[in-house]
From Swiss-Prot:
It is an enzyme of class 2 (transferase). GO terms for molecular function: rRNA (guanine-N7-)-methyltransferase activity. This is Ribosomal RNA small subunit methyltransferase G. Keywords: Cytoplasm, Methyltransferase, rRNA processing, S-adenosyl-L-methionine, Transferase. Signal peptide: none annotated. S-adenosyl-L-methionine binds at G74, F79, E97, A98, T99, A125, E126, R144. Belongs to the methyltransferase superfamily. RNA methyltransferase RsmG family. Its EC number is 2.1.1.-. It is found in: Cytoplasm. It comes from the Bacteria. Specifically methylates the N7 position of a guanine in 16S rRNA. GO terms for cellular component: cytosol. HAMAP family: 16SrRNA_methyltr_G (MF_00074).
Amino acid sequence: MNELVYGLSALGISLNSVQLGQFETYYQELVDYNSRINLTAITEYKDVQIKHFLDSVSLVLAGIKGDEKLLDVGSGAGFPGLPLKILFPAIQLGLLEATQKKARFLSEITVKLGLSGVEIISQRAEDTAQNPLYRQKYSLVTSRAVADMATLAELTLPFCAVGGRVIAPKKGDIEEEMDRAATAVKKMGGRVFKVIKVELPGLEDGRKLVLLEKISNTPALYPRRAGIPAKTPLI
């Protein structure tokens, strides 16, 4: 895990032996499971350390304290939620993943990593956000899903408690995308708080963290039915 350790040193973070072992196990299980179902196109040891593990942990630049209630929307193979949980064991983590096969991997890897305080939710975000058990219950929500910011706002902000934040990793020039998302962010009860540049070893490709703050309750009609936020963003 030399690449990960080096990258974390730039953040002033060091891993203990247990955490190093967990990341090693995570890599081995990811590659093994990926041979049976498609979890990720990134499988080389160095690339996983940088593009999955370090990229996930870079969310600490947004001021994560380590004791939050965090929801990872569209978690896939567990990024960024599980690397953050390894780093901060006190986080109460929800992993929301609609694809059953991926959700099964998340359940299995959570056990193999010896993690507690993790809930796997295998449902669509649009449906889950209307459930009182999850709606406006999280202090932090994140998603690495490849989606327009307007769509992401509708799929993430309804989970945020007022005063909570959404952390959305993005890359490249996002000014136009953020302009398009202004309506969706406002309708969900949010505001753009700040945009943070990510400049870490191996991640010098224009990565950014978009921070949204939840300032009022999301109206009951949002999010709209499954698939609509992606097909017809609120712009």
